[in-house]
Amino acid sequence: MYTIYADDVLLYTPDVEELCLYDIVLTMEDNSAGTLIFRMTSSHPAFDSLKKLSTMIRVEDSRRVIWKGRIISDDRNIDNIKTIQCEGKMAFLNDSIFPEFEFSGAPDQLFGQIIENHNSQVGENQRFLIGDVTIKDNNDYIVRSSESALKTWKAVKEKCFQSALSGHLQIRYDADGDYIDWLEDYQEIS
């Protein structure tokens, strides 16, 4: 059974009529933040409390977190029905800048450096714990550089998983925090 929370307050559960949401669509894709879109009527208790870019949304399946994100739009139509669109936590990598750099070393070191830099620039709920890195280079030695600063998301894309190393980014939601993994093969999509 799926449930949705807004800042740890129950927003949707299928067995409580007053917490009804409509047209719920959760999209999770490879190497992407994913999206959550839903509609809510003005009779919903949280109708006026959801705030763009600050309310954290969490989707659970049988008490297991499968997706987290934030609201990026909340359009209201003439019938006073809101359409809420959310972006997944991986999109938070757009909230920080990775400076120009020259790097030589192991892939996991570069990935760790990029994520640690991101964490130093953002709030607590936008941070990631560095998770599993199963990507390997034949020599365990790569060279990467950029002559200009990049959004962290672009740095991860271009210098890690869209490079010759490839792989998949995955966010794991564990009790002790949200881990970002860079995997050679997917374990599961989140």
What are these regions (language model features)?
Residues 2-4, 36-38, 57-59, 71, ...:
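Hydrophobic beta-strand residues in large extracellular and virion-surface proteins
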Residues 19-28, 71-76, 169-171:
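Short amphipathic beta-strand and strand-loop transition segments with alternating hydrophobic
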